[in-house]
Amino acid sequence: MEKYSFESVQELSLRPNVWEEYIGQEKIKKNLKVFIEASKKRKECLDHILFFGPPGLGKTTLSHIIAHEMGCNIKVSAAPMIEKSGDLAAILTNLNEGDILFIDEIHRLSPAIEEILYPAMEDFRLDIIIGSGPAAQTLKIDLAPFTLIGATTRAGMLSNPLRDRFGMSFRLQFYEPKELSAIVICASSKLGRSLSKSGADEIARRSRGTPRIALRLLRRVRDFADVGEYAQDMRNQSEISLECVRYALNELGVNELGFDELDLRYLAILAESRGKAIGLNTIAAAMSEDEATIEDVIEPYLLANGYLERTAKGRVASPKTYELLHIPFLEQKGLF
């Protein structure tokens, strides 16, 4: 059910397995610990959980830690892989009592699949319709009690009936720089490389509040420290220095705010509109990117940090964007 690229395998090796290793999201951790202990005390399955928020904040990692703390198996799937009722039935009927089913991108489940999921979540029962028309029959299959953990970057796209069936719902927040710095230092030791505190702080500052980005940048910094042009200067150093980190991140095109070429291109398009709202489809066409990438990857951090505003008519650059691009609001010229 799970398929990993080489990069994702590396990410798995850096993933915390217990609460003590998991940094950040303190309020969520505190509540989950209570709910897990209560379920274990009553010898019941944990109630169904929904995690939502921007990508890369630890939804999958939290799910694996929950499974570890509950002492149960976790089976991982993604909504696009569950195309037919038979796909979901095969997954659910193979779950043992107390198992966790993690479905990523759960907002992409089709309405037909959702209909099958409702009784499974509420009554641990599958209702399968066999045949069609007047001769159609409903086959009821009892399921072992299980916990469904859904993850999504678009909670607003979940249907109300599905959302209401989750007993717990948590929104993951962007991380503070000090939390990301601690994550990077811990990960660097797992990678077998020592990283200076100032170097970890620099990676954290340019990671857009996102652990996944911080870990990706750390791996690329390590590459530059090992074999890049800066490697020769690293031979007599016991740890990766701040200077090496800055060199690597600058070479990667990640500026001091964590913005790359795609982010700056997006902001430039907004700024060129001279304060007029621009529709998402227009921005996507101008950037040659799909709308989902813009909504899920580019916009969340920019929105959270006040670089744009969403209105009924579209996206509008904030004064902060004009300041970043050094463009006086009333004197905007063509940027391209």
UniProtKB/Swiss-Prot annotation:
> What does the UniProt entry say about where the protein is found?
Cytoplasm
Tell me the residue numbers annotated for binding DNA: R310, R315
Residue numbers binding Mg(2+): T60
Q: Which InterPro entries match?
A: AAA+_ATPase, AAA_lid_4, DNA_helicase_Holl-junc_RuvB, P-loop_NTPase, RuvB-like_N, RuvB_C, WH-like_DNA-bd_sf, WH_DNA-bd_sf
- Which positions bind ATP? L14, R15, G56, K59, T60, T61, E122, D123, F124, R165, Y175, R212
Tell me a GO cellular component.
cytoplasm
Q: Is the keyword Hydrolase assigned to this protein? A: yes
Per its record, what are the GO molecular function terms?
A: ATP binding; ATP hydrolysis activity; four-way junction DNA binding; four-way junction helicase activity
Q: Which reaction does it catalyse?
A: ATP + H2O = ADP + phosphate + H(+)
EC number(s) in its UniProt entry?
A: 3.6.4.-
Q: What span is annotated as the signal peptide, if there is one? A: none
Record's keyword terms, sorted: ATP-binding, Cytoplasm, DNA damage, DNA recombination, DNA repair, DNA-binding, Hydrolase, Nucleotide-binding
One of the GO biological process terms = DNA repair
Q: Where is this region: Head domain (RuvB-H)?
A: 256-336
Q: Where is this region: Small ATPAse domain (RuvB-S)?
A: 176-253
Q: Where is the segment annotated Large ATPase domain (RuvB-L)? A: 1-175
Query: What family does the Swiss-Prot or TrEMBL record give for this protein?
Result: Belongs to the RuvB family.
How does the record describe its quaternary structure? Homohexamer. Forms an RuvA(8)-RuvB(12)-Holliday junction (HJ) complex. HJ DNA is sandwiched between 2 RuvA tetramers; dsDNA enters through RuvA and exits via RuvB. An RuvB hexamer assembles on each DNA strand where it exits the tetramer. Each RuvB hexamer is contacted by two RuvA subunits (via domain III) on 2 adjacent RuvB subunits; this complex drives branch migration. In the full resolvosome a probable DNA-RuvA(4)-RuvB(12)-RuvC(2) complex forms which resolves the HJ.
- UniProt domain comment: Has 3 domains, the large (RuvB-L) and small ATPase (RuvB-S) domains and the C-terminal head (RuvB-H) domain. The head domain binds DNA, while the ATPase domains jointly bind ATP, ADP or are empty depending on the state of the subunit in the translocation cycle. During a single DNA translocation step the structure of each domain remains the same, but their relative positions change.
Its function, per the record, reads: The RuvA-RuvB-RuvC complex processes Holliday junction (HJ) DNA during genetic recombination and DNA repair, while the RuvA-RuvB complex plays an important role in the rescue of blocked DNA replication forks via replication fork reversal (RFR). RuvA specifically binds to HJ cruciform DNA, conferring on it an open structure. The RuvB hexamer acts as an ATP-dependent pump, pulling dsDNA into and through the RuvAB complex. RuvB forms 2 homohexamers on either side of HJ DNA bound by 1 or 2 RuvA tetramers; 4 subunits per hexamer contact DNA at a time.
Q: What is this protein's name?
A: Holliday junction branch migration complex subunit RuvB
Gene coding for it: ruvB
